[in-house]
Every structure is written in structure tokens, then in C-alpha cells.
């Protein structure tokens, strides 16, 4: 049902005795369109008309006779994704809202397992997925329809040939002349191919018309690569090809062609929500050379954002820092001038500021800041996990040290004490030795295990051991848990400063964050790992470090151990030399100076001393 558009009489206007029949009344739809045209004309001729119309339009409810219907918009967007057998297969689709006040605000998202989706027959119908509220995964804000299929290798080759052809298609006619073909062969870096360019051109030109089109080039590349590879080097980055098969070479070059253009047809690495919304592409796959994009170490000290790898979703996540804060932290922590300021009183200033802020966040007035905080991190705090209702928190600090519902953080291999687990919701770095940590991450000139643990907790086994760093951000769950089962031997409180634990400071050679900050060192004596040092380190704005266990207590891995009051903070666990084998994915990310986003209870590593589990059993209890 609906209103049919009115039909006007098409007769010419001539004299006549009879009156012309009256025109039918315009439909509601036509009246609505007419008003839109008039408004558009008025706005076009009136300065500031848009603002006026917007203001008046939102100031009143719509009248019944003005309602024409609800526009249903269908957006079709195709994205090609490289799927590896043992690689990432969870795709995240994010919906952003953009207006004059807020740019690219995440309003909904969904996640889909591509492996699961590809096993379904979606040729005749699409899969409808629910869009979830970023602040509460239990709330549905909309739906999205997607379809997915495996691209035929021939289609992949043709698509690749089209991209390659565009490099030297100077007149943009979709075809290659002999001179353009010659330039393409030279770009491929194959000396043998250059010597017989004309022969290859004739071989490609199947119909003998003196030009090579896209289909002919695709056929040449496909056939010749099997016999005598034409492409020795990537024409974009110069990397040597042929290490794998031709499909991997094609994927590598396609990613190179796409990078930075904002016109990506294929994704082989990982995008953050922010990067995807801006159309950025960063190469972080096995087909790309990692040196082309610096993560962690360099970007952490020079950029206004930090990239971390989400272990659960296998995605990069962008941790954005306010630009003004970045500038101030660089000035303070990454310059000799800043070092001078630190030595002349900034240490005391930061400490006093943190103490005052801690008191403020424990006052009843601070409760009003909770909604603002949730709005700021609405896509990173899941309120469904919080144990107590939001209205029960009487101060900001009560909310900040909130407890989670039972089962919100399952513990990997709970009955197996040979498996260590993550101690905090955090960004994690693992290192097999102190030398590795200082080479890849910690740039303070005076960092050492002895300095970290203090003179009262000295052990040669620990000093030569391995370490893991858990960095907590303000939006994280701020209670820390026991990573291994054992007996608590001692607690040693070490006074100190309250520098930030942000990578901008950690990566600085001018200050020694971990060995100068206020911290509490506890020793856990275990049968599986020997002695493990658990170091809770305060940071800027951290009012206090509270422990819930005492000396002599036996603790089981996953037990709640303590919490940090308001601010960012860090936990460092030091294991004896060769006592633990960290999980391979954590070590691989750390080797690239890339932090891994983990949750309490995720697997950290396995004891090298008492291996009660077989490798296949270890896989079963892996919690990621």
C-alpha cells in the first residue's frame, strides 16, 4: 500500500468552451518532496541557512502530515580478507557515527568467525548479525547483513593482474603497449626476463593485435610463474619474492599496492577500529616485511597512540592518548630538559599531585565523574561483567576498584599448577632475559632486576631470570590476581616516585620508571617455578596499592591478590632462570616491541621443571 503519484493532464493549453478538469490533489509524498525542494532552495540562497534549519528542525516534533516514511538505506561494501589456516579468522565489523561534534564515534559492532561463515551456503541468502552496544555486549543496537564466499584462484590472479597493469598503464586505457610492457618487466627485477621482453610480449599477445590486455597479462603471469618466474622482486617494496608459492607472492604485492592509498581491496594484516574507519592500512602479515611499519617501541615514544595486539580477537587495538598529554610526556620524559626538571622537584610534584588526586577520587563528590569515565571508554568497559550495580558505587574509587562477577575471568588449566596465567587485565610484554627486555622495550639506563626488587629481595636465580610486564590502563579492571600457586614468603614496600608507566616514559633513556617508582615486592614460593617475584608498581595518579593476602598464606593461581586505586599502574613478575617457557605468541609480539592485550586467567606459559602435561593436553587447556 502507499500513495500513488498524481498524474497531471498533458493536454496543451488551447482555448475551449469547457473548463479544464481540476488537477488531482498532490499526494503526501509529493508535498513532502516539494517542501524539501523549497527548503533546499532557501538554504542555498541564505548564508548560515544550514545552521538555522538544523536548529529549527530539531526544536519541534514532526507533524503527521509531514511524515513521508522512514528511509531504509542499504550500503554494500566489499572487502577481501586473506584467511590463513592457522591465522586470525575473527572479523570485527564496527559502525561509527560522525557529526560536527564527534568524529568517528563507535556506536555498534559485531564479530564473526570467517571459518564458520565460510562453511555455510550463503549464495542465496545473507547472514544477519546483531550489532552490539560497545559498553554492554548484552544490548543490541541494530543489525547488519553480510555474505561471504571463497574467491576463485583465477579471479584472484585476474584481480592481481589488473593492479599490476595499472602501474605502467600510462595512458590508462587498460592495455599495455610494448614500451609499457617493457617497463613492467624491468620493475619486476628479473634480468632474464628483460633480455627476452619482445618474446614474452608476443607470447602474451594471444590475438596478435599488438597490445596486451588484462586477461592476457593474467594468463602470462599465471603460466610463466610456474615455468620460469617473471617476478623476482616486489615492484613496490623491492622484497625478494619466490620464498613461498605464487599465491603468496600475489598477496604480498597486492598488500604493498594498497598500503597508504585508502583504497584497499585486500587485507592481510590487522586494522584497528580507528584505522579501519579512516581507511588506513598497515602491513602486519607474514607476507609483509615487519620493518615497513614500526610498532610498540618507536611508535610508543613518538606517536599520539599506542598499538597493542588483542590476544582474544587477534586484532590490533589503538590506545589513543590526548595530544596535549603526549606533548607534555615527551617534553618531560624524553629530553634532557625534562630530566633536569625531574631532578629539580618534578618528582615531588608528581607524588603530591597523585596523593591529592587519590583523596579527591575517594570523596562522595567524585561519583559524578563515573558517567563521564564510562562515556570516554564506553567501548572498552563491559558493565555486564561488573559484580555490583552502578548506583552502588558512592565514590569514583569504589567503581575504579570494582569487582567482577564470578566466572567473568576463567582461569586456564585451573587444576594444573604447571601452567602460569596472566595476573591482570593489561598490555603484556614477555622477555626471556633482562638483556632482551632492555634491548626491545625498557630503555632506562639503570634498569636491572636487582634495582627492581631492592636489596632486601636479592636472589641470583631471579637476577638472571625472565620477566613479564603487565601494564594496566585507566579503563582496565584494576584488581590483580596470583599468576602461580604457592606460599607467600614476604612483602617488601619500596618507596619511590610516581612516574607514568606509559611506553613514552618506559622507552625513555632519561628516566628509570620501574626501578624508581613506588612499588611493593612479594615473593611466591612454588614447587613448579621455584621462587617468583610479584612486583606491584604505582604510577602517576595511583593513590595506593592494596594487598588482600598476608605473609604465610597459600595462594592458588587466579586468586584475587590486590588492587590499585585510581590511575594507571603495572605489575612485573620475575621468574627464575629457565623456570618458565612463555607462550610463543607472547614472545613473538614482544620481539616486535608490540604489547599483547590479555585478561586475567589467560595462559602465560608452562613450567620447564615439572611437565606433567603432554603437548596435546596443553592445547586443550589453552585459554585465549
UniProtKB/Swiss-Prot annotation:
Topology relative to the lipid bilayer, per the entry, is:
Peripheral membrane protein
Residues that bind Ca(2+) 2: 205, 207, 209, 216
Q: How is the cofactor bound?
A: Binds 1 pyruvoyl group covalently per subunit.
Q: Which residues constitute the catalytic centre?
A: 425, 481, 569
Q: Which cysteines are joined by disulfide bonds?
A: none
Gene Ontology CC: endoplasmic reticulum membrane; vacuolar membrane
Q: Name one GO biological process term.
A: protein autoprocessing
Q: Name one Pfam family in it.
A: PS_Dcarbxylase
Per UniProt, the keywords (alphabetical) are: Calcium, Decarboxylase, Endoplasmic reticulum, Lipid biosynthesis, Lipid metabolism, Lyase, Membrane, Metal-binding, Phospholipid biosynthesis, Phospholipid metabolism, Pyruvate, Repeat, Vacuole, Zymogen
Q: Which GO terms describe its molecular function?
A: calcium ion binding; phosphatidylserine decarboxylase activity
Query: Function, please?
Result: Catalyzes the formation of phosphatidylethanolamine (PtdEtn) from phosphatidylserine (PtdSer). Plays a central role in phospholipid metabolism and in the interorganelle trafficking of phosphatidylserine.
Instruction: Write out the similarity annotation.
Output: Belongs to the phosphatidylserine decarboxylase family. PSD-B subfamily. Eukaryotic type II sub-subfamily.
Q: What is the official name of this protein in its record?
A: Phosphatidylserine decarboxylase proenzyme 2
Q: Which organism is it from?
A: Oryza sativa subsp. japonica (Rice)
Q: Which gene encodes it?
A: PSD2
Amino acid at each position: 500500500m502507499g500513495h500513488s503519484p498524481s498524474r497531471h493532464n498533458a493536454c496543451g493549453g488551447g482555448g475551449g468552451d469547457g473548463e479544464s478538469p481540476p488537477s488531482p490533489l498532490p499526494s503526501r509524498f509529493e508535498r513532502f518532496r516539494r517542501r524539501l525542494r523549497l527548503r533546499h532552495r532557501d538554504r542555498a540562497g541564505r548564508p548560515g541557512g544550514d545552521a538555522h534549519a538544523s536548529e529549527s528542525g530539531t526544536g519541534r516534533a514532526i507533524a503527521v502530515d509531514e511524515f513521508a516514511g522512514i528511509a531504509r538505506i542499504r550500503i554494500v561494501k566489499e572487502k577481501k580478507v586473506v584467511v590463513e589456516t592457522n591465522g586470525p579468522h575473527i572479523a570485527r565489523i564496527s559502525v561509527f557515527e560522525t557529526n560536527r561534534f564527534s568524529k568517528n564515534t563507535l556506536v555498534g559492532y559485531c564479530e564473526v568467525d570467517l571459518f564458520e561463515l565460510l562453511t555455510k551456503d550463503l549464495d542465496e541468502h545473507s547472514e544477519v548479525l546483531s550489532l552490539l552496544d560497545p559498553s554492554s555486549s548484552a544490548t543490541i543496537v541494530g543489525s547488519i547483513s553480510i555474505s561471504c564466499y571463497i574467491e576463485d584462484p583465477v579471479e584472484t590472479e585476474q584481480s592481481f593482474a589488473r593492479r599490476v597493469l595499472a602501474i605502467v598503464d600510462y595512458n590508462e586505457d587498460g592495455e599495455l603497449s610494448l614500451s609499457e610492457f617493457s617497463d613492467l618487466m624491468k620493475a619486476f627485477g628479473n634480468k632474464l626476463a628483460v633480455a627476452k621482453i619482445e618474446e614474452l610480449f608476443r607470447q602474451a599477445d594471444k590475438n596478435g593485435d599488438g597490445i596486451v590486455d588484462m586477461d592476457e597479462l593474467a594468463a602470462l603471469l599465471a603460466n610463466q610463474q610456474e615455468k620460469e618466474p617473471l617476478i623476482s622482486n616486489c615492484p613496490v617494496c623491492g622484497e625478494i619474492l619466490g620464498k613461498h608459492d605464487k599465491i603468496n607472492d600475489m598477496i604480498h604485492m597486492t598488500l604493498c599496492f594498497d598500503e597508504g592509498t585508502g583504497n584497499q581491496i585486500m587485507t592481510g594484516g590487522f586494522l584497528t577500529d580507528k584505522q579501519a574507519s579512516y581507511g588506513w592500512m598497515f602491513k602486519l602479515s607474514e607476507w609483509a616485511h615487519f620493518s615497513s611499519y614500526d610498532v610498540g617501541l618507536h611508535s610508543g615514544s613518538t606517536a599520539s597512540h599506542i598499538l597493542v595486539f588483542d590476544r582474544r580477537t587477534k586484532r590490533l587495538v589503538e590506545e589513543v592518548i590526548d595530544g596535549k598529554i603526549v606533548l607534555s610526556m615527551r617534553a618531560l620524559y624524553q629530553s634532557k630538559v625534562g630530566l633536569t626538571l625531574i631532578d629539580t622537584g618534578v618528582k615531588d610534584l608528581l607524588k603530591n599531585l597523585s596523593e591529592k588526586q587519590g583523596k579527591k577520587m575517594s570523596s562522595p563528590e567524585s561519583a559524578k565523574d563515573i558517567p563521564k569515565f564510562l562515556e570516554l571508554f564506553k567501548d572498552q568497559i563491559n558493565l555486564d561483567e561488573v559484580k555490583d550495580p552502578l548506583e552502588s558505587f558512592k565514590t569514583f574509587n569504589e567503581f575504579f576498584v570494582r569487582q567482577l562477577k564470578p566466572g567473568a575471568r576463567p582461569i586456564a588449566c585451573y587444576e594444573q599448577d604447571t601452567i602460569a596465567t596472566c595476573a591482570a587485565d593489561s598490555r603484556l610484554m614477555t622477555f626471556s632475559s633482562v638483556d632482551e627486555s632492555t634491548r626491545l622495550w625498557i630503555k632506562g639506563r639503570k634498569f636491572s632486576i636487582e634495582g627492581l626488587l631492592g636489596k632486601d629481595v636479592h636472589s641470583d636465580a631471579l637476577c638472571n631470570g625472565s620477566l613479564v610486564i603487565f601494564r594496566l590502563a585507566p579503563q582496565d579492571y584494576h584488581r590483580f590476581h596470583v599468576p602461580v600457586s604457592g606460599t607467600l614468603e614476604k612483602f617488601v614496600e619500596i618507596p619511590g616516585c610516581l612516574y607514568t608507566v606509559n611506553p613514552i616514559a618506559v622507552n625513555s633513556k632519561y628516566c628509570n620508571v620501574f626501578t624508581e617508582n613506588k612499588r611493593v615486592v612479594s615473593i611466591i614460593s612454588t614447587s613448579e617455578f621455584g621462587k617468583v617475584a610479584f612486583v606491584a608498581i604505582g604510577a602517576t595518579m595511583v593513590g595506593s596499592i592494596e594487598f588482600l593476602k598476608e605473609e604465610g598464606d597459600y595462594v592458588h593461581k587466579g586468586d584475587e591478590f590486590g588492587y590499585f586505586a585510581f590511575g594507571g599502574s603495572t605489575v612485573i613478575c620475575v621468574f627464575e632462570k629457565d623456570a618458565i617457557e612463555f607462550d610463543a605468541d607472547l614472545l613473538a609480539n614482544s620481539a616486535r616491541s608490540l604489547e599483547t592485550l590479555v585478561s586475567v586467567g589467560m595462559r602465560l606459559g608452562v613450567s620447564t621443571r615439572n611437565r606433567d602435561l603432554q603437548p596435546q593436553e596443553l592445547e586443550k587447556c589453552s585459554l585465549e
